[in-house]
């Protein structure tokens, strides 16, 4: 079910269409094109965040449209009952790309942080022209195990309690952890470009570099940047990167 809501032009004259894809709030940026970039935001973010806006501004100049949407518990969906668990997000990304296949000839993807991880799972067998990843999570099991170590949570305890709230506000879920362990990233045949911050304290450099080497990705390391690209210099680097790879 695809529901159209409204179309308007933002202050920078960019066309934005707000609608829903199977009740998932979405935004389509830019003028009609045969090329679409599906943009998957990161944790604690939303479908109109700054990296996606920069992507839309840059991409529209090169004849791309951008399709972004809110993950569960994010943006317009903060009060929904659906949780932002990996298994739910993979299902939703599958719905999004099926919609894209109906409307565009060339499909590209942009994934930010955990959005890249969900993309790796959901799109691995899809016909994607290129993937663009910013601060990508490529080994979720490692990140969850690190959190369990930090907060003294054993596998046995997590299995028994099913859900554990951590001091940083992030829940640990047994079913999430189990899904991650059962679905490692073992194949990825899509031409991929990565922008990674040298000071990223969430995604360890050696893990990202090993991923890039294993799957023959083009990687650019931003020396002064952290996991969250947000400073004026970070965003300038991001914009320049988009201009170069699109």
Language-model segments: what does each one mean?
Residues 3-32:
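N-terminal cap/lid segment of alpha/beta-hydrolase-fold proteins
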Residues 44-56, 206:
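The serine-hydrolase catalytic nucleophile loop
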Residues 56-78:
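Conserved alpha/beta-hydrolase
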Residues 111-119:
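Gly/Ala-rich beta-loop-alpha elbow adjacent to hydrolase catalytic centers
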Residues 127-210, 214-246:
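The alpha/beta-hydrolase serine catalytic core
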